[in-house]
Amino acid sequence: MGQLIAKLMRIFGSQEHKVIIVGLDNAGKTTILYQFLTNEVVHTCSTIGSNVEEIVLRKTHFLMWDLGGQEALRSTWDTYYSNAEFVILVIDSTDRNRLLTTREELYKMLAHEALQNASVLIFANKQDVKDSMTTAEISQFLTLSAIKDHPWHIQGCCALTGEGLPAGLQWMQAQATAN
């Protein structure tokens, strides 16, 4: 009976899906969140703690938690994992020096029990910048092909123009309606 009600809610009603947006500092997490919300560039400063906004895409409601990415704040990310259905990992495609740190944080998250059923969307941000890493390069460095227990998708984007962001949201919406 509960499954029937859940299915009817997905078809006819709206169900809220918790999303956490993570990534190292200055990757573009907050810019992406507000690009989703307003379709405009919003001047941001470093997030201390979190920002929360609801994004609606065709009856699918996403409650998005944008978490600060500074080193001192990353240890608090796990307090937001409970009931998260999606993880959006934002990567600065120009920051080759910290990609190892990003990989470590990604696999630490994926190993967390509270995220065992989460789908992962990776935004390779700043694709508009010359010599930025491609999604293929990032995918290879992060060894994304080794991720077997989580549906995942990597999407190149530019947070400032919004390019690539709708495709990522559509992937999330498809994942939400498939479950």
Curated annotation (Swiss-Prot):
Pfam family membership, one: Arf
Q: Sorted alphabetically, which NCBIfam families does this protein's record hold? A: small_GTP (TIGR00231)
What are the UniProt keywords, alphabetically? GTP-binding, Lipoprotein, Myristate, Nucleotide-binding
Q: Hey, which family's this protein in? A: Belongs to the small GTPase superfamily. Arf family.
Binding, GTP:
23-30, 66-70, 125-128
GTP-binding listed as a keyword: yes
Identify the InterPro entries for this entry: P-loop_NTPase, Small_GTP-bd, Small_GTPase_ARF, Small_GTPase_ARF/SAR
Instruction: Return the protein name.
Output: ADP-ribosylation factor-like protein 5C
Q: Which GO terms describe its molecular function?
A: GTP binding; GTPase activity
What PROSITE patterns does this protein's entry cite? ARF
Residues anchoring lipid (N-myristoyl glycine): G2
Gene3D superfamilies in UniProt: P-loop containing nucleotide triphosphate hydrolases
The job of this chain, per UniProt, is described as: Binds and exchanges GTP and GDP.
